[in-house]
Swiss-Prot record:
Name of the protein in question: Chaperone protein DnaK
Pfam families attached to this UniProt entry: HSP70
Species per Swiss-Prot/TrEMBL record: Pseudomonas fluorescens (strain SBW25)
Region entry Disordered, spans: 602-638
PANTHER family: HEAT SHOCK PROTEIN 70KDA (PTHR19375)
Record-stated family: Belongs to the heat shock protein 70 family.
Biased composition (Low complexity): 604-618
Length: 638
């Protein structure tokens, strides 16, 4: 069996590693570099250039040179973040027939996984040249906060590149693996702060030693999938454009060639300012007008760069705070802070991290290489070559289904260790309901409509039965790649439906962050909504059971009793449509009171103790683990 390689498929740069003699080794590419720019170019003669060669010709071929494509992977064209990206890049981002964000080169539309596959092919070839054998299997890393569709799309890219992706693992977790292999004995908790080219992640990871085996358990993860070094570059580019405009009156934003030169210069200046206090951006012949050629020469200090990007660095701190809270630990419990991603070389980033965590970050882990090395270690674990490492990763967001009253019922809570499988039994909302629709949701809010819809599917041919009687078992199964599979089974007939949540639009970074912020800010509102939904469900159940009881009682109910009960039922139905929980509860009590004598007659006749409304409020609740679910009836298409 061949080696399983580890690939860090980055927004800006990619890296490949393999296990040799018990250690992860980063493999140099054909140009002799340990990392490869994640840049793909389509030359006029049809040649596809990848890496450094693509980067070198970007200035003369801006429209056909693709970079930061990872920011589009698994996303819809109409998403706000994609629309923002369109304004920033010189190449064309187009809308695919399925609504995804694709790129267009020379009139040909291509998907983000297709483009990413070119980088993966280069990584595969780099490993094959070094190992002298064909490579078919890989572990590929993704940002911890990548959603289901982004993970699926990354796996697709691997398949397009001719790789069997054995596992998708989170970048911070991979970095912790690379770091933890050489650690001293004993248990310790680490923070992995990963600020790369296009994404930011933070993970709280516990490394425990159990019977000589290193166990890596992710306690919590958080992040922003649209914040990274590219955003820092954009701030610097905008500043340079403004300075040139002040001096010459010309706007470079309409000139793709000039903007490509500026992008290169800004990235170079940003890197230089990590070790120097100031630098010059000098671009002769940047453009020309009727008076002749124009030159750009701007001096930038480290302080100026820090002022331009300070809010971006500050944006990384709140996810750190949330991750610690979710992990249930305080800053004092952290043993080490690991910095991953090239952008963490910036002194301001290091300073803010040190201030927040109260300790200096470790400098002995190469921020550009740690992720690929961790992926190679995980590859060796899967191949059975490394036996003393166990990796326990987590699902970053809560997953559940929509149930009665528009509530999201969670099956898998956020930060649950994966792989995992959870089942819960639900039932029908109407008598003789022949089909149910399972609506799968992802997010942190109590109201179903406030969360992201991942998909719907139907379970049909349910035998006719009163509401609450059928038992529909819904199962959520997250595999080791963090990809979700959902099934629904009618326990009476054994009929089953399953879906894998396919690579649809998934969640945008703004939605994910907003969900968690909203969930915290609106905790009280969510609790009130949950109570109101509970009261509505109780009212609906009482209306249904009371009407059934009156029908069953027949002539044992007097006309006066029937009229009083009907009036109370109508009043409760009206209250249930409103938003006043107290009013619903008052009408429930009223209906319970007027229907109690009839209930007593019925139970007395059957020789059972009468307990009025308490007995008849939910006569069909035969199963404690059955939850009323709001399922839609599906009509057969004739």
């Amino acid at each position: 069996m061949g080696k399983i390689i580890g690939i860090d498929l980055g927004t800006t740069n990619s890296c490949v590693s393999v296990m040799e003699n018990g250690k992860a080794k980063v493999i140099e590419n054909a140009e002799g570099a340990r990392t490869t720019p994640s840049i793909i170019a389509y030359a006029n003669d049809g040649e596809i250039l990848v890496g450094q060669s693509a980067k070198r010709q970007a200035v003369t071929n801006p429209h056909n040179t693709l970079y930061a494509v990872k920011r589009l992977i698994g996303r819809k064209f109409d998403e706000e973040v994609v629309q923002k990206d369109i304004k920033m890049v010189p190449y064309k981002i187009a809308k695919a027939d399925n609504g995804d964000a694709w790129v267009e080169v020379n009139g040909n539309k291509m998907s983000a996984p297709q483009i990413s596959a070119e980088v993966l092919k280069k990584m595969k070839k780099t490993a094959e040249d070094y190992l002298g054998e064909t490579v078919t299997e890989a572990v590929i890393t993704v940002p911890a906060y990548f959603n289901d569709s982004q993970r699926q799309a990354t796996k697709d890219a691997g398949r397009i590149a001719g790789l069997d992706v054995k596992r998708i693992i989170n970048e911070p977790t991979a970095a912790a693996l690379a770091y933890g292999m050489d650690k001293a004995k004993g248990d310790h908790t680490v923070i992995v702060y990963d600020l790369g080219g296009g994404t930011f992640d933070v993970s709280v990871i516990e490394i425990a030693e159990v019977d000589g085996e290193h166990q890596f358990e992710v306690l919590a993860t958080n992040g922003d999938t649209f914040l990274g070094g590219e955003d820092f570059d954009i701030r610097l580019i905008d500043y340079l454009v403004d300075e040139f405009k002040k001096e010459s009156g010309m706007n470079l934003k309409g000139d793709p060639l000039a903007m490509q030169r500026l992008k290169e210069a800004a990235e170079k200046a940003k890197i230089e300012l990590s070790s120097s206090m100031s630098t010059d951006v000098n671009l002769p012949y940047i453009t020309a007008d009727a008076t002749g050629p124009k030159h750009l020469n701007v001096k930038i200090s480290r302080a100026k760069l820090e002022a331009l990007v300070e809010d971006l660095v500050q944006r990384t701190i709140e996810p750190c705070r949330i991750a610690l809270k979710d992990a249930g630990i305080d800053v004092g419990s952290i043993n080490d802070v690991i910095l991953v991603g090239g952008q963490t070389r910036m002194p301001l980033v290091q300073q803010k991290v040190t201030e927040f965590f109260g300790k200096e970050a470790r400098k002995d882990v190469n921020p550009d290489e740690a992720v690929a090395m961790g992926a190679a270690i995980q590859g060796a674990v899967l191949a059975g070559d490394v036996k003393d490492v166990l990796l326990l990763d987590v699902s970053p967001l809560t997953l559940g289904i929509e149930t009665m009253g528009g509530v999201m019922t969670a099956l898998i809570e956020k930060n649950t260790t994966i792989p995992t499988k959870k089942s819960q039994v639900f039932s029908t909302a109407d008598d003789n309901q022949g089909a149910v629709t399972i609506h799968v949701l992802q997010g942190e809010r109590k109201q179903a409509a406030q969360n992201k819809s991942l998909g719907k599917f139907d379970l049909a041919e349910i035998p006719p039965a009163p509401r609450g009687v059928p038992q529909i078992e819904v199962t959520f199964d997250i595999d080791a790649n963090g990809i979700l599979h959902v099934g629904a089974k009618d326990k009476a007939t054994g009929k089953e439906q399953k879906i894998t949540i396919k690579a649809n639009s998934g969640l945008s970074d703004e939605e994910i962050q907003q969900m968690i912020r909203d969930a915290e800010a609106n905790a009280d509102a969510d609790a009130k909504f949950a109570e109101l939904a509970g009261a509505r469900n109780q009212g609906d159940a009482l209306v249904h059971s009371t009407r059934k009881m009156v029908a069953d009682a027949g002539d044992k109910v007097t006309a006066e009793e029937k009229a009083a009960i009907e009036a109370a039922v109508v009043a409760l139905e009206a209250a249930v449509k409103g938003d006043d929980k107290a009013a619903i509860e008052a009408k429930i009590e009223e209906l319970s009171k007027v229907s109690a004598p009839v209930a007593q007659k019925m139970y007395a006749e059957q020789g059972q103790p009468a307990d009025g409304a308490a007995q008849q409020a939910e006569p069909e609740a035969k199963h404690d683990d059955v939850v009323d679910a709001e399922f839609e009836e599906v009509k057969d298409q004739k």
